[in-house]
Amino acid sequence: MESKKPLILVSNDDGVMAKGISELVKFLRPLGEIVVMAPDSPRSGSGSALTVTHPVHYQLVKREVGLTVYKCTGTPTDCIKLALGSVLDRKPDLIVGGINHGDNSAINVHYSGTMGVVIEGCLKGIPSIGFSLCNHRPDADFEPSGPYIRKIAAMILEKGLPPLTCLNVNFPDTPNLKGVKVCEQAKGCWVNEWVTCPRLDDHNYFWLTGSFTDHELENENNDHWALENGYVAITPTTVDMTAYGFIDELNGYCQQLEF
């Protein structure tokens, strides 16, 4: 009996109609059967948010040989939970988020709905990868990333990933990629994050904006440096946020507390 093709579950935070997810599906189709469960509209910046105040529902968008596409009224994480719990008839071999319009390097990983997809897959014990491009334009050119996406996804299908570990892969916006660089997450922060917009009724409103400040400009081992220098940044990311290096010291402090 012929073995089943690998099942790859795909989602994003830019919405089911975004070019990035369409291109991702195109790149992944040679590797297996693709099921898309993506938000019905953009959900950028939603992180691992869940919908808990009202029901969500999903709808079939397209079905053809090797590809099924659904849209969902929930968040990216809702999409993965719903697909795994109520839609798919078998466990995916791989979960892929993206391709995000805009990078998810450095601290952006904490805010990203695309990485929320990946983190949820990781928590479910499924190898998971997030792909992002440093270009926010709706018509961004994803073509240079295609061969890298196929090879990285095929590698993880074959090799797997350690428990509670996923991959955060970011592409610089250039047709001349220099290759891949395995990186650590850059340390930095966003500054000047809000623009105040006055209104005639004296009630100001605010647009989220800002710029990223890298605190380690000379660190050639972080993802921000790799992207600035034309490399595909691959960052192994863990969902275990325990500060193991501080446990013993904190335990010492706590032993001195009196209750």
UniProtKB/Swiss-Prot annotation:
GO cellular component, one term: cytoplasm
Keywords: Cytoplasm, Hydrolase, Metal-binding, Nucleotide-binding
Taxonomy, superkingdom: Bacteria
EC id: 3.1.3.5
Cross-referenced InterPro entries: SurE, SurE-like_Pase/nucleotidase, SurE-like_sf
Note on how the cofactor is bound: Binds 1 divalent metal cation per subunit.
Location, primary (coarse class): cytoplasm
Alphabetical list of Pfam families matching this protein: SurE
CC cofactor: a divalent metal cation
Family, as annotated: Belongs to the SurE nucleotidase family.
Protein name: 5'-nucleotidase SurE
Organism: Bacteroides thetaiotaomicron (strain ATCC 29148 / DSM 2079 / JCM 5827 / CCUG 10774 / NCTC 10582 / VPI-5482 / E50)
